[in-house]
């Protein structure tokens, strides 16, 4: 990704301590662009409500940290996704206090596809790890992207189950993406980069800090249609994620466990508070599939307005697009890249259409990122 003037401006803001979404919203209402904000004097920015430290950091950023971020962005797989970027996930934008910039390693398109968060205890039981893996496999095979926080225990089990099937998974981190925390998950993080995405609101060079992880948890829930808590003690950080999900109007699911297990007490509390008790991935799919399909169709209808013929109904244009995609698939396994070449659509368009077809039971996903039509081949 190039470090254009606008991107450089966003980096100035991302590196400024104490600049939150609310303050940036006020600034954008007063100035025409990020570049114009960065060209103001410190006193002008302070009149807009910023502290002296934040204002000075915007107009005169730390040269070393800025250079580090710019070098990081020269890698093809590294991205800076800002509020006004086409790839900024709309579901996260809907959430309160969403970060104004995301650093991403891997495929940023995944952030806008339907996701389910799977979270839980770092000190998970063997049964908890097995359960997280089982749910992650079933949910990813049903077309959802599994999102978690790259922590040990439940998070790692959910990510690993997806990676082992070559399914996409999103890991939200509480550090800069030039480092992995915990270090034990370096190999897992490298695998996620290849088939999914690593995400952080923190720029390169930022070390782990206890205050970062609640912010990470808010992004996890904000990206997701729902949050599943597999195992959690009464003070588990997973309960923070579930709390954010509820605040954001998202679904909260919890798996019950033994009344004698400390790692079940958090889930039992959530269920008492109204979380949906689930025993199988099908319970979640039944609840979230209609939302996933509706959001994807809404996204597609917005883009389709620009491409469809005059006076042709949007629904008709969308249906024609699906018919074209199914015809291009044929009856043999095919990859997303193969369909992009056959249809002339973007990878994002093909991916979202495939997800809808999968949720509707018309196609199935196979190993190696391939898809195939279900049913009987027409003669």
Residue ranges and their predicted role:
Residues 2-6, 82-379:
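Glycine-biased, small-residue-rich flexible motifs in mid-sequence functional cores and linkers
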Residues 1-87, 362, 367-379:
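Short, small/acidic-rich helices and loops at N termini and domain boundaries
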């Amino acid at each position: 990704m190039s470090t254009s003037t606008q991107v450089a401006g966003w980096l100035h803001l991302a590196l400024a301590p104490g600049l939150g979404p609310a303050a940036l919203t006020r600034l954008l209402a007063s100035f025409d662009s990020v570049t114009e904000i960065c060209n103001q004097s410190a006193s002008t920015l302070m009149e807009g409500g910023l502290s002296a430290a934040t204002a000075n950091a915007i107009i005169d950023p730390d040269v070393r940290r800025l250079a580090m971020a710019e070098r990081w962005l020269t890698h093809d797989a590294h991205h800076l996704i800002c509020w006004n970027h086409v790839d900024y996930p709309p579901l996260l934008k809907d959430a309160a206090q969403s970060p104004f910039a995301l650093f991403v390693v891997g495929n940023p398109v995944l952030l806008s596809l339907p996701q389910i968060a799977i979270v839980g205890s770092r000190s998970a039981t063997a049964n908890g790890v097995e359960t997280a893996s089982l749910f992650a496999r079933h949910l990813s095979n049903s077309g959802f992207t599994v999102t978690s926080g790259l922590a040990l225990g439940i998070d790692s089990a959910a990510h690993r189950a997806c990676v082992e099937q070559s399914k996409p998974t999103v890991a939200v981190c509480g550090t800069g993406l030039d480092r992995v925390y915990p270090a034990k998950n370096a190999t897992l993080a490298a695998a996620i980069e290849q088939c999914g995405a690593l995400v952080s609101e923190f720029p390169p060079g930022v070390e782990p800090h206890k205050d970062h992880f609640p912010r990470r948890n808010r992004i996890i829930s904000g990206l997701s249609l729902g949050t599943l808590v597999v195992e959690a003690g009464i003070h588990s950080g997973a309960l923070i994620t579930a709390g954010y999900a509820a605040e954001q109007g998202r679904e909260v699911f919890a798996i019950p466990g033994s009344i004698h297990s400390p790692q079940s007490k958090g889930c039992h509390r959530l269920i008492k508070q109204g979380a949906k008790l689930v025993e199988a991935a099908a319970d979640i799919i039944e609840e979230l599939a209609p939302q996933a399909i509706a959001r994807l169709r809404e996204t597609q209808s917005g883009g389709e307005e620009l491409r469809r013929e005059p006076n042709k109904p949007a629904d008709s244009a969308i249906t024609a697009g699906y018919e074209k995609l199914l015809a291009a698939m044929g009856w043999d396994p095919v990859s997303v890249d193969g369909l992009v070449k056959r249809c002339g659509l973007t990878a994002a368009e093909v991916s979202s259409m495939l997800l809808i077809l999968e949720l509707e039971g018309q196609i199935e996903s196979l190993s190696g990122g391939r898809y195939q039509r279900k049913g009987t081949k027409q003669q």
